[in-house]
Amino acid sequence: MKLSKYIDHTLLKPQATEKDILKLIEEAKTYDFASVCVNPSWVKLAYENLKDTDVKVCTVVGFPLGATSTASKVYETKVAIEDGADEIDMVISVGQLKSGNDEYVKEEIKKIVEASKNRLVKVIIETCLLTEEEKVKACTFSKEAGADYVKTSTGFSTGGAKPEDIKLMRETVGKNMGVKASGGIHTREEMEVMIENGATRIGASCGVELVK
C-alpha cells in the first residue's frame, strides 16, 4: 500500500474555517489520502466535495473528551452518517473505563458500531490517560464490540501516539483489526516507526509534509 493511503488528513481545530476545510479536501484529492477527518459540522461539505473520489469522509464522535452520554454519541453517529460520513472515530468514556465500569464501555462501543450501519468505526482510547492494563482492556472491548480499529489519541489531551503503545495495541487486537496512530506525528520517520510497530492508519494534520 502506498504511503498516502495510510493517512487520515486531519483538521479538528475549533477555529478551522470553511476555507481551511476546503484546502484540506483539495490536498486530500491531490495526494490521494485515505480520508479527511473533520468535525461533524463539516461532514456535509466534505461529502459534497469528495463523493466522486475514493477519499473517504471521516468524522469524530464524543470528541474530544469522550464524556458525553452514550445516547448523545449514538445520535452524533447517526447524523454524521446521514450527512455522508464513511468513517466514525469515537472517543471512549475514559472515566467509566478507569472506574472499572467495563460493561458500560463495551456496550457503548457496541451501540456506536450498530448505529454506524457498517461504516468503519475507530475507537479512540486516549492512551496518554491509561495504564497499560487499561489500554489492553480498551483494545479488547473494542474488538469484542465489533469495531474496526483502535486509535491512540484525540490529539487534544496530554500526549499523542507512542511506538510502544502501537506495539501493545497490535499485540492485543491481533493482525486482523486496524490500529490507528494519531497525535504528534510530524515527520515521515515518525510515521514509518508507527507503521513498523503495527499501525495501519495514521492520523495527522501535516499529511502533505509526510508524503512529500
From Swiss-Prot:
Gene3D superfamilies the record matches: Aldolase class I
Keyword Cytoplasm: yes
GO molecular function, one term: deoxyribose-phosphate aldolase activity
This protein's record includes keyword Cytoplasm: yes
Residues of the active site: D89, K151, K180
Enzyme class, broadest EC rank: lyase
Pathway named in the protein's UniProt entry: Carbohydrate degradation; 2-deoxy-D-ribose 1-phosphate degradation; D-glyceraldehyde 3-phosphate and acetaldehyde from 2-deoxy-alpha-D-ribose 1-phosphate: step 2/2
Principal subcellular localisation of the protein: cytoplasm
Pfam families tied to this protein: DeoC
GO cellular component, one term: cytoplasm
Catalytic activity: 2-deoxy-D-ribose 5-phosphate = D-glyceraldehyde 3-phosphate + acetaldehyde
EC number: 4.1.2.4
GO biological process: 2-deoxyribose 1-phosphate catabolic process; carbohydrate catabolic process; deoxyribonucleotide catabolic process
Database matches in InterPro entries: Aldolase_TIM (IPR013785), DeoC (IPR011343), DeoC/FbaB/LacD_aldolase (IPR002915), DeoC_typeI (IPR028581)
Function: Catalyzes a reversible aldol reaction between acetaldehyde and D-glyceraldehyde 3-phosphate to generate 2-deoxy-D-ribose 5-phosphate.
Similarity section: Belongs to the DeoC/FbaB aldolase family. DeoC type 1 subfamily.
PANTHER family recorded: DEOXYRIBOSE-PHOSPHATE ALDOLASE
HAMAP family noted in UniProt: DeoC_type1
Protein name: Deoxyribose-phosphate aldolase
Organism: Clostridium botulinum (strain Okra / Type B1)
Taxonomic classification: Bacteria, Bacillati, Bacillota, Clostridia, Eubacteriales
Encoding gene (name): deoC
